[in-house]
């Protein structure tokens, strides 16, 4: 796909940064879009700007702060603690987030003549978010194509990878140290290895430890 262009939904976290490095290897031109939705870890906006500036990637930033007016969760309401709800979902789940992100990304992509959209959602080793499921992404892809009469292709390179395999992918792309030290996954806004306690950090560390152990025994 070296003669194609792509738009990466980008947060500056482990997953989207790994997707960005893969996109840079696979496509002739790559742009990214980041969303400001009043997230607890607002530092991710600065991290996204720094990473894209360093890599020389065109960066679009869109304001979706209205999300905090529509739904209550601990990712946009800083007064809430991060817990697990009765339905088993972390309190950090933001209703409609990926639906809106991908819909706005598609509008932007079409306007720029891009049909490939890349997102780092994953169903294998995740927090149970329903909008990270493969069935949702495929359904939305069809809906967006019909809604805008445009041949979008939503790519989910991490969908069936666990966190250990995601670290392995970053390593194969020559980006292991960059992803480990420069990205922000932590819900408490701590770059790199994070706080170690929030759900995002726990998943990241579990995968990192497993990958390092595997490499050491290879």
Curated annotation (Swiss-Prot):
<comment type="pathway">
    <text>Purine metabolism; 7-cyano-7-deazaguanine biosynthesis.</text>
</comment>
<keyword id="KW-0671">Queuosine biosynthesis</keyword>
<feature type="binding site">
    <location>
        <begin position="10"/>
        <end position="20"/>
    </location>
    <ligand>
        <name>ATP</name>
    </ligand>
</feature>
<protein>
    <recommendedName>
        <fullName>7-cyano-7-deazaguanine synthase</fullName>
        <ecNumber>6.3.4.20</ecNumber>
    </recommendedName>
</protein>
<keyword id="KW-0436">Ligase</keyword>
<comment type="subunit">
    <text>Homodimer.</text>
</comment>
<keyword id="KW-0067">ATP-binding</keyword>
<dbReference type="GO" id="GO:0016879">
    <property type="term" value="F:ligase activity, forming carbon-nitrogen bonds"/>
</dbReference>
<dbReference type="Pfam" id="PF06508">
    <property type="entry name" value="QueC"/>
</dbReference>
<dbReference type="InterPro" id="IPR014729">
    <property type="entry name" value="Rossmann-like_a/b/a_fold"/>
</dbReference>
<feature type="binding site">
    <location>
        <position position="201"/>
    </location>
    <ligand>
        <name>Zn(2+)</name>
    </ligand>
</feature>
<keyword id="KW-0547">Nucleotide-binding</keyword>
<feature type="binding site">
    <location>
        <position position="195"/>
    </location>
    <ligand>
        <name>Zn(2+)</name>
    </ligand>
</feature>
<comment type="similarity">
    <text>Belongs to the QueC family.</text>
</comment>
<comment type="function">
    <text>Catalyzes the ATP-dependent conversion of 7-carboxy-7-deazaguanine (CDG) to 7-cyano-7-deazaguanine (preQ(0)).</text>
</comment>
<dbReference type="GO" id="GO:0005524">
    <property type="term" value="F:ATP binding"/>
</dbReference>
<keyword id="KW-0479">Metal-binding</keyword>
<dbReference type="GO" id="GO:0008270">
    <property type="term" value="F:zinc ion binding"/>
</dbReference>
<feature type="binding site">
    <location>
        <position position="198"/>
    </location>
    <ligand>
        <name>Zn(2+)</name>
    </ligand>
</feature>
<dbReference type="InterPro" id="IPR018317">
    <property type="entry name" value="QueC"/>
</dbReference>
<keyword id="KW-0862">Zinc</keyword>
<feature type="binding site">
    <location>
        <position position="186"/>
    </location>
    <ligand>
        <name>Zn(2+)</name>
    </ligand>
</feature>
<dbReference type="GO" id="GO:0008616">
    <property type="term" value="P:queuosine biosynthetic process"/>
</dbReference>
């Amino acid at each position: 796909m070296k003669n194609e262009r792509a738009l990466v939904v980008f947060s500056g976290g482990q997953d989207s940064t790994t997707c960005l490095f893969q996109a840079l290897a696979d496509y002739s031109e790559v742009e990214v879009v980041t969303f400001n939705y009043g997230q607890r870890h607002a530092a991710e906006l600065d991290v996204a700007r720094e990473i894209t500036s360093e890599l020389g990637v065109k960066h679009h930033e869109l304001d979706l702060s209205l999300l905090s007016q529509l739904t209550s969760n601990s990712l946009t309401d800083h007064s809430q603690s991060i817990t697990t709800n009765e339905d088993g979902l972390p309190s950090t789940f933001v209703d409609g987030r990926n639906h809106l992100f991908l819909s706005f990304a598609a509008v932007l992509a079409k306007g720029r003549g891009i049909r490939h959209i890349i997102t780092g959602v994953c169903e294998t080793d995740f927090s149970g978010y329903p909008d990270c499921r493969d069935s949702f992404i495929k359904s939305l892809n069809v809906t967006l194509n019909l809604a805008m009469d445009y041949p979008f292709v939503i790519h989910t390179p991490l969908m069936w990878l666990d966190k250990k395999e995601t670290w392995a992918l970053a390593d194969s792309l020559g980006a292991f140290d960059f992803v480990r030290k420069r990205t922000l996954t932590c819900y408490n806004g701590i770059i790199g290895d994070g706080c170690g306690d929030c759900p995002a950090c726990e998943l990241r560390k579990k995968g990192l430890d497993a990958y390092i152990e595997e490499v050491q025994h290879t």
